[in-house]
Structure formats: C-alpha cells, structure tokens
C-alpha cells in the first residue's frame, strides 16, 4: 500500500515537471518569435503598404534571423486612446499630426522611449519645428510630408488668357473662362467629411492666415471639452466663426461666392473622392483641391494632364503656413528594433520612403522621386511652420468630425 502511494506521488510529481517544461518551452517560443509591432492610425491603405515595405527592410537580426515587423491598423473612427486600449500599445506608431499624435507623444514620453535631438539633423527648419520634444527627447519624429494642393488642367490653362495662378482671384478668373466647357470648373470631395473639413481649413489659412485657423481650432476644442458635440452645437459655433468679423468668415464667403457664380458644381457637397476622380478623368473640371496622397492615387494617364501647386492666397508676399500634414513615427515602447528603424527612416531611407509613397521628404538634401515631392519640400521650406489637417488638430474621433462636417455643409449652403 505504501509503495502504491509513493508511486502515485512520483507520477504526479513527474507530470507537474512535464507540464512546467511545456509551459517554459511555449514561453521561450513566444519570446523568440515575438515580432515588433508597427501600428498605423489614420494613414491611407496605399501609404500604409508603402511605408510597411520600407520599414520591413530595417528589420534587425536576432539569433541570426531577421526579426520581421507585425503590422496593425488601428481603428481611427475612435480616439487613439480608445484604439490603443482595444488593440494594445504597439512598439511603433505612424500617425498624422494633431490631437491624437500629441497623445501618442505623451505616451512615448511616459515610456521614456524618445530620441536624442540629433535625429532631426538634416531636416529643414520648418519641419524640425513640428517635432514633439519633451525633456530634450524627441517623442514624435517627422518622416514624411503630405500637402493640400490645387491640381490645374494644363491644356485648358495654356489655352486661356491667364498667365499665372498666383492668387485665388486668378484661379477664379480661370474657372470663369473654363465654365462653358466644363460641368464644374472647381471641385473637391466636399461630400467626404474629412476632405471637406481639411480643404476648408486650408482655405481659411490661404485667405485669413494661421492665427485665424488656430483661433477657430481653440474654439472647437473648448466646445468639445464641455461635451457640446452635436450637429446643432457645431452649427452655433460655425455661425459665430463664419459671420461678419468671425475668424473664418472670408473662407466661407469665398465658397458661397463660388457656388453663386457656378464655378462649383451644384452637387459639390455630395461629391466623394470617386466623383472627383471621374470628373478629372472626363475633363469635366479644370481645378481640383486635394492632398498629395490623393494625387498619387490617381492613374498616371489622368493626373499627367494636371499641374499641381500650393493653394494660393489673396495677396502676394504674405507669410504662409501651408496645410502640409506631417506623418510622424512615434516609438511607443522601449526597444532596439523600433528605435533603429526610426533613425533610418528619418535619414538614410528618406529617398526610398519618398519614392515608395510619393510624399515629400523631411530631409532637405535627399533626392526625390519627381517634381511633385520636391516642390512640396521647397514650398514648405520657403513658408512658415506647416499646419496639420484641421480634421486632426480639432477632433479626435469620427462622430465629432461627422457632426461638424454636416454643420459646415449647412452653413456653406445658406
């Protein structure tokens, strides 16, 4: 009986040891096969794929094997804070500048995962100033520059009596001339909430300057902070901003005027990006407002008919702060792989990154793939510190953007 009991204890002991060994093996396998996680928030699918392709080349060797990245797309319909709570904190985050990027930079600072300021070496000064720095550590590193632009149909422009489009009045005159041969001379995706907000924000800067943009943003943030996020609340705020004497009055009046003289199509506030693409493909418009990212998404045989430029203002020789959204790489946790990758992306891989994405570099001297990305670099460098997208600097989630955009459409249609 005693022998049986001893044998039973031995079997139990050996079983426990066996289970422990299995658990240790699984843990070791998990650690050895861990992939550094790179996440994307609010970055278009084409830009994600192109950044991923370059990022994967930066993988460092571990146990004689390259440690590949694991990629995650975060839910950008909610705030970044909520998205991270749902998906977990990645090692590395790519994000456009704005409120959510500010939050990510604060997380990086808490984790003490930033970079020394020499990571900004070689960047043009206006871009260096967009970097997020806390306690002498760079927590948000600029790696690419997007840009809100106008695309002008060359054939119609060259056959017109307009020699240059230096001012919005030149653009309007060109559109008037082209009105008889087009359905809508001037277009943008005003049915898309984000595009409406961002193009409108870019126009506010163009006609009223940076201070007007920032004053409006401050009022929006205060409204949101007290929970007034309904369409009617935003409508009341926009009435104040766009009324005579309001910070955004001139931009709103400009779009209303363009609608009145029929250089915007009648369905402008229903137009989506696909509609803009169709109009350009069929030569139904001569000027389109869009981002460089969207410019790159168009087929070459379509966009080759158009020349891109910055959105002009109402006066020459006035300092501009162009709406040129910066994409940041933010290290969210300490780790050799992510740290090494960001250093490469911000410097030696700039040419590859720009060639793959078609966006502008942050380095002042690196070669660029074509004239568009080089022009954006030059324009931003020659202007004041670039502004982020209004949709990102004023809001953190989709519901608030949607409510605001609906209120803005109502204002602009009045």
Regions found by a protein language model. Name each.
Residues 72-82, 169-170, 266-281:
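Short helix-initiation/N-cap motifs at beta->coil->alpha
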Residues 1-100, 353:
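Conserved N-terminal structural module of periplasmic/extracytoplasmic solute-binding proteins
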Residues 97-149:
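Hinge/lid segment of periplasmic solute-binding proteins
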Residues 215-269:
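Glycine-centered hinge/linker elements that transmit conformational signals in sensory
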Residues 287-290, 294, 299-360:
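Extracytoplasmic/periplasmic substrate-recognition and gating elements
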Residues 320-323, 353-414:
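C-terminal capping/gating helix-and-loop segments adjacent to ligand/active sites or protein-protein/ligand interfaces
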Residues 91-95, 285-291:
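Paired acidic/hydrophobic, glycine-rich loop segments that form the ligand-binding mouth/hinge
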Residues 174-236:
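Extracytoplasmic/periplasmic solute-binding protein
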